[in-house]
Amino acid sequence: MEGQTLDKIIIENLKGVVEAVLIDEPKKFWIELRQNGEMVGRIWWDVTEFDFSIDYIKVVFWFEDKDYKTVAVRADVDEICEEVKKYFK
């Protein structure tokens, strides 16, 4: 995974489950989850702690349904993708 950005990791991880599209606009940045072209949820993340002196960054991921209700919050990109996969089974 080295050299990959979080959005690319999420998009690749969810292939075949749900379409994941990066929304990158001024003041907007998240992964929109779509089925048949319709938005069915989203994943967004925020840096909660960082210390560049020791190269440490903690990121928290939110998975929300189409009504923007939180389904899961995880501190690991693979775990949040697993929550999305379970939700759309």
Model-identified regions with their sequence ranges:
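Weak global preference for isoleucine
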Residues: 9-11, 23, 31, 43, ...
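Intrinsically disordered, low-complexity regulatory segments enriched in Ser/Thr/Pro
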Residues: 39-75
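Charge-rich, solvent-exposed alpha-helical interaction surfaces
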Residues: 9, 13, 17, 76-83, ...
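Generic detector of intrinsically disordered, low-complexity segments in short proteins
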Residues: 33, 87-88
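General N-terminal targeting signals
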Residues: 23, 48-50, 87
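Alpha-helical interaction segments
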Residues: 19, 34-35, 51-53, 77-78
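Negatively charged, low-complexity tracts enriched in Asp/Glu with abundant Ser/Thr
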Residues: 1-38, 62-70
